[in-house]
Amino acid sequence: MAATSAQHIGLQGHGTSRNDRDRRLVRYWLYAVFAVLIAIVMVGGATRMTGSGLSITEWKPIHGVIPPLNHAEWVEEFEKYQQIPQYQQINKGMSLAEFQYIFWWEWAHRLLARFVGFLVAVPLGFFWLTGRLKGGLKYRMLGLLALGGLQGAIGWWMVASGLSELTSVSQYRLAIHLTTACVIITAVFYIARGLVTYSERPAERSIQRFAGWIVFAVLVQIYLGGLVAGLHAGLTYNTWPLMDGAIIPSDLFTQAPWWRNLFENPKTVQFVHRMFAYTVLLLAILHAVQVWKNAPGTTHARRTIVLVGLVFIQAMIGIATLLMSAPLHLGLTHQFFALVVLAFAVAHWRATKGAYAA
């Protein structure tokens, strides 16, 4: 039975002690990947908020690791940036030192992205060749590696949208890039938490499903947040709880066809992001009520209280960010806490499914 269960989760079953060691090693590896992914998203957020995302105008997956090393190379890189609309229309007259500041943000973001590829690929090869992975887990890891490669391509696709006509990247592509990163984070953390031994029985199926829907709702809200960021929609209505003195502002559907407002009208995008934040909080509360009714006093129930608290704190951070017109420190705090909420929701969802047998 133990060997069957071990194979079910994709770990080589050579007895409990070997299996436990392998499980622990793989879990710690995935935690390291998870931590670097969080760092990538946060540096990416800082890159966006400092207007640095278009500072590197070429995609060089290998040679791009090496930054300019002397004055002549810096001037050459700066001249490339001077050819794009963002410089010509917004940053004209920028000094070389100012360019270097935005360059380093984008370079660090890309360097971390390359590093996480090695952090996945090299240990994956080691675990695979030494028999520490088997079956499904192997292919899940290969899937993550492929998804990471796709994310790199999405990142360049996003940057390319701001190099010819726009002065910033497309909000559509920015939101997709951010959401894909969070899907990868979700998958990595879900698999890692699946390698933990839980002491409590799995929750009933309805609880598991609701927990999964909350993860999905958080991902949707992150996507909406990406649209807000891409359109600078956080600078439209800087009051709360009303927007322009109304619960529902009058200028939400000024573009035709109407659905374009949901993606291209900054006021509408902020409105939807606000309303969905309330929806996520309501879902978390309803889930807590469900679990306390059906599994009172359990660890599952206690986790739902923490989840509600985290969602509430994130809402308060969002309100503060809005009222202060999205300063860098609050914008990054809001983004980081979104990842905290997502990670806890994923951990809770995985835990409701119970322990993998050793």
From Swiss-Prot:
Pathway: Porphyrin-containing compound metabolism; heme A biosynthesis; heme A from heme O: step 1/1. GO terms for molecular function: metal ion binding; oxidoreductase activity, acting on NAD(P)H, heme protein as acceptor. Its main location: membrane. It is found in: Cell membrane. Heme binds at H273, H334. The chain crosses the membrane at residues 25-45, 111-131, 141-161, 176-196, 210-230, 269-289, 304-324, 326-346. InterPro entries: COX15/CtaA_fam, HemeA_Synthase_type2. It catalyses: Fe(II)-heme o + 2 A + H2O = Fe(II)-heme a + 2 AH2. Keywords: Cell membrane, Heme biosynthesis, Iron, Membrane, Metal-binding, Oxidoreductase, Transmembrane, Transmembrane helix. Its EC number is 1.17.99.9. One of its GO terms (cellular component) is plasma membrane. Pfam families: COX15-CtaA (PF02628). It is a multi-pass membrane protein. The keyword Manganese does not apply. GO terms for biological process: heme A biosynthetic process. It is an enzyme of class 1 (oxidoreductase). Interacts with CtaB. Belongs to the COX15/CtaA family. Type 2 subfamily. Catalyzes the conversion of heme O to heme A by two successive hydroxylations of the methyl group at C8. The first hydroxylation forms heme I, the second hydroxylation results in an unstable dihydroxymethyl group, which spontaneously dehydrates, resulting in the formyl group of heme A. This is Heme A synthase. It comes from Brucella canis (strain ATCC 23365 / NCTC 10854 / RM-666). The gene is ctaA.
